């Protein structure tokens, strides 16, 4: 079937391309991050086939969700953009790529916390919501992805409400703050946050809420200042770190790149208690810092222990969470199919009604005026009876997910809007009521 004759159903036109900690490792995820989301949106939206886009970036993933008229070309273009950001070729097996219903399922799983490094962690739900809100504010999201992300957030909330998957769960950055709270208490303490990326922001925000005096240290001073302003803290370049270490009570290091930002020599002059927590991957703190008796060093494993408290209980909830997701996925896809059916029927009825009115006008010019009401009722009744089986077949096809039948109906009746318009009207309650009124069904 020619591309122009296709009846688009937005789920079919959805792709997701990305990298995450499972397939690529956190170091590659860090490299692939887009420091300027607006520049990323601009680049992705220039891909000719892309109609809508949402960029979901967290500490553990960079994922691009797009509605497109050419899935293959769009996937290849997004892969190229991610490779350009990473500064290196990315092997095929390190990409995560989903199409259509599988892409929706993946997003629902992400929002529910099933794909998180810490099972059920709560931060991801907020991040999914904020990603869609940012795309909407900047004009890159349309009706399809708006509906998809709204449902993902709703499903994520339902999973957390109806299961214990997220009970007691926190992400790694939040867990590092909890660990410090348990070790030294954060109220009034001077905390250095090394790194102003996603993880650093979570640490800084949570620590500030607990009363810590937050100092952001980053290679790029402008980014440090931006985050410091958000949390009411101070900002310094990385070169100031050795001096700051002597004054701090605690440090959380959340950087990428693989180099050591805190070495044994860097803490040689520390002469009061200092807790250093490294949540970088790969590690960015030399374990030898613990040779200084004043330094308490905690690595990712120590933080993971805090994050994974109650993990076995949460694991037992995975099946229930997955059942909820599959049920919601079926409802979501069927909803989209029903919307398409309503769109076809509305366009069909409008077209047939216009033909009826035109032909009725011609007939009325040749018969006495007193027959007008009779002819109007007769032709209206005739149209309803002729189209009744078509309407039932369209409804039945939508219920079965039979897009072939829906396409055939749209082609036979030359329904141009249904054939060529990529967007679908999602709020169809008014359409349904109008159809019921017209057809008396």
From Swiss-Prot:
Record Pfam families: GlutR_dimer, GlutR_N, Shikimate_DH
GO biological-process terms attached to the record: protoporphyrinogen IX biosynthetic process from glutamate
The record's note on its domains: Possesses an unusual extended V-shaped dimeric structure with each monomer consisting of three distinct domains arranged along a curved 'spinal' alpha-helix. The N-terminal catalytic domain specifically recognizes the glutamate moiety of the substrate. The second domain is the NADPH-binding domain, and the third C-terminal domain is responsible for dimerization.
Transmembrane segments: none
Organism: Ignicoccus hospitalis (strain KIN4/I / DSM 18386 / JCM 14125)
Entry-linked InterPro entries: 4pyrrol_synth_GluRdtase, 4pyrrol_synth_GluRdtase_dimer, 4pyrrol_synth_GluRdtase_N, GluRdtase_CS, GluRdtase_dimer_dom_sf, GluRdtase_N_sf, NAD(P)-bd_dom_sf, Shikm_DH/Glu-tRNA_Rdtase
NADP recorded as keyword: yes
Additional detail: During catalysis, the active site Cys acts as a nucleophile attacking the alpha-carbonyl group of tRNA-bound glutamate with the formation of a thioester intermediate between enzyme and glutamate, and the concomitant release of tRNA(Glu). The thioester intermediate is finally reduced by direct hydride transfer from NADPH, to form the product GSA.
Annotated GO MF terms: glutamyl-tRNA reductase activity; NADP binding
Active site residues per record: 59
Pathway linked to the protein: Porphyrin-containing compound metabolism; protoporphyrin-IX biosynthesis; 5-aminolevulinate from L-glutamyl-tRNA(Glu): step 1/2
UniProt keyword terms in alphabetical order: NADP, Oxidoreductase, Porphyrin biosynthesis
Site feature Important for activity, where: 106
Disulphide bond pairs: none
Subunit structure: Homodimer.
Principal EC category: oxidoreductase
Gene that encodes the chain: hemA
Reaction(s) catalysed by this chain's protein: (S)-4-amino-5-oxopentanoate + tRNA(Glu) + NADP(+) = L-glutamyl-tRNA(Glu) + NADPH + H(+)
Binding site for substrate: 58-61, 116, 121-123, 127
Protein name as annotated: Glutamyl-tRNA reductase
EC code(s) of this entry: 1.2.1.70
Family as reported in the entry's similarity comment: Belongs to the glutamyl-tRNA reductase family.
UniProt binding sites for NADP(+): 195-200
Keyword Acyltransferase: no
UniProt function note: Catalyzes the NADPH-dependent reduction of glutamyl-tRNA(Glu) to glutamate 1-semialdehyde (GSA).
